[in-house]
Amino acid sequence: RSYIEVKGRIHGSETFTVTANEIQFGQTQKEHHKLALVDVHPDGPDHDEIRYITQAFDHIESNVTTQSYNEKWRDYWSRGAPPL
């Protein structure tokens, strides 16, 4: 079984938000979890782009007092790959 967490942002956005629960779930699912980033282009869906990132949240240490994280879009985008 695979799980995909989808985050879409308007083209040019600098950050995206991910909750502590989403991070924890991704970390427990390991290779069964993918983060899908959707770059939504203002010129329409023909210009949208998608990147898949595996083990996207492995570098984050969860904190019980933190409910969400603002992550740098560019950092994750550069780690991803387009769909096959």
Describe these PLM feature segments:
Residues 29-34, 38-84:
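Domain-level recognition of nuclease-like catalytic cores that cleave nucleotide substrates
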Residues 1-8:
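Conserved catalytic cores of phosphodiester-cleaving nucleases, focusing on short active-site segments
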Residues 13, 24, 42-45:
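Accessory, usually C-terminal, subdomains that scaffold auxiliary metal cofactors
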